[in-house]
């Protein structure tokens, strides 16, 4: 349109510009004729097949790439439409290779499309380099065999253009490298090895690129349908279960404030074992399970907290009392029993201190004071008895210690 405007302007003279309506009409005409001109340019593009000897109406890769580079700036359309138009200019092996590459990469744009074309059909490398790349192309970890074959085909075409293999040897070289560099099922590997052995002297009867892709895809679909869904999960070994932290996880400790409950000790009899019993009886009504977080988060001092570790506090039975009679615990969460060592405060009758019993008291420094207090107490009791005898109506009492 710019060339048309310049020609019209020059024909009318430099001092006679076009009226505004002419510019508007030409712009509308350009928008209408643009797709038609692009379609005509596409129809005039020569074809490319990738064969060693181009057929009638086909171009070499260099000529095809040159005309594509010249027409791309006039294609004002999305990338997908550009790739679709480029595919229309391909025939034969070139079309099949790029179709498979596009299927493996749905988001293929024009830049990647041309880069792949240059890699497969561009200038040939040296025969040593091309052969080395081909034989060193192996399947990557996690890569499907079908995608590996596409990658292998790129290196095979480069090797053919470099003169490493003849056209009739392509099927044999492709199949041999596939067996070397790919991981596949035992059945498919056996079938391909058998084909390679049977048609060793007739390589043209071996499966070509498209037939090989079809065989591999059928095998992959069969494995995904019948084998992968039935594959059992790996059984967890006994050692893994033993080392699991969940195997040693017990019930969380229950913190009970001494303000909310009474701790009752049941004295041991000579027949009892070394395990004592603690009865915890609440003064408040049981808390619902929804308030467990606030119950556990209550701020109390350390000497007012009793920690009881119990796997199931609702199924513990009450121990037998001093009379030997036992009863089941039917009070639910309120009554907790645990056969462990004493957790309550013990008062020593020997030295008057807390934290130990008379049998384990070793406070030698206070023994004299204890005896002195005992003598004073006995004297007061004697005096009180004498006063009671002297004055029968007077009440008996103990004088306050001085």
Curated annotation (Swiss-Prot):
Keywords: Metal-binding, Transcription, Transcription regulation, Zinc, Zinc-finger. Residues 1-20, 383-402 are annotated as: Disordered. One of its GO terms (cellular component) is nucleus. Pfam families: PNMA (PF14893). One of its GO terms (molecular function) is SUMO binding. A zinc finger (CCHC-type) spans 346-363. In embryonic brains expression is restricted to the ventral region of the forebrain, including the septum, amygdala, caudal putamen, and in the basal-forebrain cholinergic neurons. In adults, expressed in the brain, and at low levels in the testis. GO terms for biological process: BMP signaling pathway; positive regulation of transcription by RNA polymerase II. It comes from the Eukaryota. Belongs to the ZCCHC12 family. Interacts with SMAD1 and CREB-binding protein (CBP). Forms a protein-DNA complex through its association with SMAD1. Transcriptional coactivator in the bone morphogenetic protein (BMP)-signaling pathway. It positively modulates BMP signaling by interacting with SMAD1 and associating with CBP in the transcription complex. It contributes to the BMP-induced enhancement of cholinergic-neuron-specific gene expression. This is Zinc finger CCHC domain-containing protein 12. It comes from Mus musculus (Mouse). The lineage of its organism: Eukaryota, Metazoa, Chordata, Craniata, Vertebrata. The gene is Zcchc12.
């Amino acid at each position: 349109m710019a060339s048309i405007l310049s020609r019209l302007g020059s024909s009318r003279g430099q001092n006679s510009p076009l009226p505004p309506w002419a510019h508007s009409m030409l712009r509308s005409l350009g928008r209408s004729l643009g797709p038609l001109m692009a379609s005509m340019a596409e129809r005039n593009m020569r074809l490319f097949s990738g064969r060693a000897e181009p057929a009638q109406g086909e171009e070499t890769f260099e000529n095809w790439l040159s005309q594509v580079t010249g027409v791309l700036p006039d294609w004002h359309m999305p990338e997908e439409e550009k790739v679709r138009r480029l595919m229309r200019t391909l025939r034969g092996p070139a079309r099949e290779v790029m179709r498979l590459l596009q299927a493996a990469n749905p988001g293929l744009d024009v830049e990647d499309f041309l880069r792949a074309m240059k890699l497969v059909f561009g200038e040939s490398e040296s025969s040593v380099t091309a052969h080395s790349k081909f034989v060193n192309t192996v399947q990557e970890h996690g890569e499907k065999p079908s995608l590996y074959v596409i990658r292998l085909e790129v290196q095979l075409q480069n090797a053919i253009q470099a003169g490493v293999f003849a056209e009739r040897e392509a099927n044999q070289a492709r199949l041999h490298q596939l067996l070397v560099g790919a991981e596949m099922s035992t059945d498919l590997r056996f079938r391909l090895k058998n084909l390679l052995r049977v048609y060793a002297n007739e390589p043209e009867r071996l499966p070509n690129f498209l037939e090989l892709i079809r065989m591999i895809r059928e095998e992959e679909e069969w494995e995904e349908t019948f084998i992968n869904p039935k594959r059992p999960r790996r059984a967890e070994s006994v050692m893994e279960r033993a080392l699991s932290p969940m195997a040693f996880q017990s019930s969380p400790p229950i913190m009970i404030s001494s303000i909310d409950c009474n701790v009752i000790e049941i004295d041991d009899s000579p027949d009892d074992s070394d395990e004592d019993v603690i009865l915890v009886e609440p003064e408040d009504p049981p808390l619902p399970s929804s308030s467990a977080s606030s119950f556990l988060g209550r701020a109390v001092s350390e000497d007012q907290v009793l920690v009881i570790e119990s796997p199931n506090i609702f199924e513990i039975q009450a121990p037998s009392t001093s009379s030997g009679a036992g009863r089941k615990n039917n009070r639910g969460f309120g009554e907790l029993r645990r056969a462990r060592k004493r957790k309550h405060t013990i008062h020593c009758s020997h030295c008057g201190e807390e934290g130990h019993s008379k049998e384990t008291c070793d406070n030698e420094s206070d023994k004299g004071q204890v005896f002195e207090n005992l003598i004073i107490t006995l004297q007061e009791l004697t005096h009180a008895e004498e006063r009671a005898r002297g004055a029968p109506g007077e009440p008996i009492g103990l004088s306050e210690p001085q």
